[in-house]
A protein has these predicted regions:
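Beta-rich carbohydrate-recognition and catalytic domains
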Residues: 1-9, 13-76, 87-92, 98-149, ...
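Conserved beta-strand position repeated once per blade in WD40 beta-propeller domains
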Residues: 9-11, 81-83, 155-157
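Transmembrane beta-barrel architecture of outer membranes
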Residues: 79-81, 123, 153
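C-terminal structured interaction module
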Residues: 150, 155-159, 166
Length: 198
């Protein structure tokens, strides 16, 4: 259960706001937000990808407003697979991810609560956030939540359809092997999701 440290499951983001510090008109630049598998919680890994004239791609670290290079970024649920979607109507990014509430639990106690792997692997709480810039995230609410850790809702994907946000995710119930190896796919609808912006 203890995979090596690393990054995986990238989300590709293009910053279109010309006032965003990471936006540039000079080159085609994309940002990769990746799940950070570190044993910790609420961080993601960040790469910048610059597409050259010959279509080759050059990866590099991004910089903070102070000029320091940045590799990891505070990110709600960045320790498990997450999904970012951009809403052109409001110009907000939306994030669907798992919420950690108990990551400081002793590993020896995990079998008592049916948690899979490490203490940070809480998969039974699926949360929604919004942001103007993919850095400052505002909590919008819970998409799905259970007190039973076997009932996972994880590995989300989302699409905007009209006024609603549709989310599908790998899910589990009492018939699943564990919260990681799921036996269902569930569909969740956040109706009028733009009204959650405050």
């Amino acid at each position: 259960n203890n995979a090596p440290l690393g990054w995986l499951e990238a989300n590709v983001v293009k910053f279109v706001d010309k006032d965003h510090i990471w936006h540039t008109d000079l080159k085609e630049v994309f940002h990769l937000f990746l799940r950070a598998h570190t044993g910790g919680v609420n961080y993601a890994h960040l790469f910048k990808i610059e597409i050259q004239d010959d279509q080759s791609m050059i990866p590099s670290l991004e910089h903070t407003p102070s000029g320091q290079k940045i590799s990891y970024i505070p990110f709600p649920g960045g320790h498990l697979k997450f999904f970012i979607i951009y809403d052109e109507l409001t110009r907000f990014y939306w994030l669907v991810s798992n919420q950690a509430t108990d990551s400081m639990r002793r590993v020896s106690s995990l079998s008592n609560i049916k948690r899979y792997g490490l203490p940070n692997n809480e998969r039974h709480r699926l949360q929604l956030h919004f942001s103007r810039n993919c850095v400052d995230w505002c909590f919008a609410g819970m998409v799905a939540c259970s007190t039973n850790e076997l009932y996972s809702r994880n590995y989300p994907s989302a699409v905007i359809k009209g006024d609603d946000l549709h989310i599908v995710c790998r899910s589990a119930d009492e018939h699943a092997l564990n919260p990681q190896y799921n036996n269902m796919i569930t569909h969740h609808i956040v109706s009028n999701f733009r009204q959650l912006i405050y």
